[in-house]
Amino acid sequence: MKHVFSTSLIVSLFVIFTDAQTFQYSRGWTNGKRSSPEQTAPSRTLLPHIPLGMDKPDEECRLLIQRFLKSPCDVRLANAIVNRNKDLLRDMADDVNDGTALLYDPVPMVDTAASEDVRFKRGTPDRRLLNDGMHRL
């Protein structure tokens, strides 16, 4: 009788935890709060902690920084913020609007080759094939 009670207790707790987790993730609840339909950008979290070098940045500069912080891997953005150069920030905005800005430097990736194990494990294409396709363009 003891085994039946303990087994039924374990199974019922498992069902309760599974249903609670399914309800939590299927309804959009995270950490006890309802997730907002609006996507939370990282810039809202990071913007107050960035030293801008200006007591009150103008609205255009603030909006540009928020826009660029959505893709924080751009090294030029970090340099612009560190150097507090508003002109460089506006030039970057022009580059993004023109479609000429890169979020990363492709040169280090050209000469590196992924090992066979990693390449086949992740299903990534061979870099040599990608480079050949880029040279044809």
Swiss-Prot record:
Residues 68-137 form a propeptide. Keywords: Amidation, Cleavage on pair of basic residues, Neuropeptide, Pyrrolidone carboxylic acid, Secreted, Signal. GO terms for molecular function: corazonin receptor binding; neuropeptide hormone activity. One of its GO terms (cellular component) is extracellular region. It comes from the Eukaryota. Residues 1-20 form the signal peptide. Transmembrane segments: none annotated. InterPro entries: Procorazonin. Pfam families: Corazonin. The modification Asparagine amide is found at N31. Cardioactive peptide. Corazonin is probably involved in the physiological regulation of the heart beat. Belongs to the corazonin family. This is Pro-corazonin. It comes from Aedes aegypti (Yellowfever mosquito).
